[in-house]
Amino acid sequence: MFKFVKSSSDYTNWYFHKNSEIAFWGRSNVGKSSLLNALTSKGLAKVSKTPGRTQLINFFENELNQVYVDLPGYGYAKLSKDLKDKMMAMIEEYLLNRSNLKMLYLLIDSRLGFTKIDLEILSFLKENNLNYFIVFTKIDKLNTKEKNELNKKIKTYLEKESFNYLIVSSETKYQIDKLKENINSNF
């Protein structure tokens, strides 16, 4: 069973331990908290309809000493530029300096596909040789035509870049077990 360990705004407050950890990141309102709750089968993370709620790095741990990290979302326009810059610096510091981090799960909203900011984040991850796995969220919100469009976008992007991905739904639990298997392979 997972439990909340702590929230942190900078390096001095990180949760220090010797175990492996994985992190979840994506646009604001992409469904990070809902996905964490689907993966852990409990209301671990606070889910909000308001984007930009998570503004700290949140650490969770289970009895197997597996650590999940919930990173603040990016791209929320209503936050001040100063706060957005501070949050991005905090996340960058975490991603570039966290030796415990084994895999970053980058969440992409299936309804939007790859946005400009998602592509910028992917470039940052590649430039810094960070391990990442793409998770397309909210597939349950798409009709058949939209699912076909998403698959075309993924195929087009795969022609340019190679990446591993899964399409999931926190709501219906579609492919959540496959994602759990992937996550467990990183511990």
Curated annotation (Swiss-Prot):
Disulfide bonds: none
All copies of domain EngB-type G, residue ranges: 18-187
Coiled-coil segments on the chain, per record: none
Keywords (A to Z) from UniProt: Cell cycle, Cell division, GTP-binding, Magnesium, Metal-binding, Nucleotide-binding, Septation
PANTHER family to which the protein is assigned, alphabetical: ENGB-TYPE G DOMAIN-CONTAINING PROTEIN, MSS1/TRME-RELATED GTP-BINDING PROTEIN
Task performed by this protein: Necessary for normal cell division and for the maintenance of normal septation.
UniProt-recorded name of the protein: Probable GTP-binding protein EngB
